Amino acid sequence: MKAITSNVSKSLPIGARLKCIDNTGAREVEIISVKGFKGVRRRLASAGVGDMVVISVKKGTADMRREVTTAVVVRQKKEYRRADGLRVKFEDNAAVIITEDGVLKGSEIRGPIAKEAADLWPAIGSAASIIV
C-alpha cells in the first residue's frame, strides 16, 4: 500500500453515518470500527479519507440492509491539508463498499472522490469519474 500524501484529519468517529456513493444498493452506512486504529483507552476510533472501516448498512435495498461489510472513506466534511498547502473539504461524508482485499463491490462511483483515497486504493481510483 502506498503512503498517504497528506495529513488527513480523522474526523469520523465510530457511530458516524456516511453516504454510500456506489451502486451496491446501500444508501447510508454507519461506522462500526476502523481497521488498523491504535488508540488510547476509552477513546473512540476515528477515520478519515482513505481509511478502511467496518460498516453496517442502515438504509438501502432490502437485501443490503443490516449487512456488515468493509468500506473506504472517500469524502469528508472536515478540511485537511495537503503537502503543497492546499486545504481540501467536501460537502458531505461518503464511503465506497469494498471487499477485504480492496476490490469494489459495485461497478460505478457517483460524485467526486479525494485524491488520497484514489492513490491508496487503485480499484477505487480507476472506477471514479472525478478525482479532486
UniProtKB/Swiss-Prot annotation:
InterPro entries: Ribosomal_uL14, Ribosomal_uL14_arc, Ribosomal_uL14_CS, Ribosomal_uL14_sf. One of its GO terms (cellular component) is cytosolic large ribosomal subunit. Keywords: Ribonucleoprotein, Ribosomal protein, RNA-binding, rRNA-binding. One of its GO terms (molecular function) is large ribosomal subunit rRNA binding. One of its GO terms (biological process) is translation. The keyword DNA-binding does not apply. SMART domains: Ribosomal_L14. Pfam families: Ribosomal_L14. The keyword RNA-binding applies. Binds to 23S rRNA. Forms part of two intersubunit bridges in the 70S ribosome. Belongs to the universal ribosomal protein uL14 family. Part of the 50S ribosomal subunit. Forms a cluster with proteins L3 and L24e, part of which may contact the 16S rRNA in 2 intersubunit bridges. PANTHER family: 50S/60S RIBOSOMAL PROTEIN L14/L23, LARGE RIBOSOMAL SUBUNIT PROTEIN UL14. This is Large ribosomal subunit protein uL14. It comes from Methanosphaera stadtmanae (strain ATCC 43021 / DSM 3091 / JCM 11832 / MCB-3). The lineage of its organism: Archaea, Methanobacteriati, Methanobacteriota, Methanomada group, Methanobacteria. The gene is rpl14.
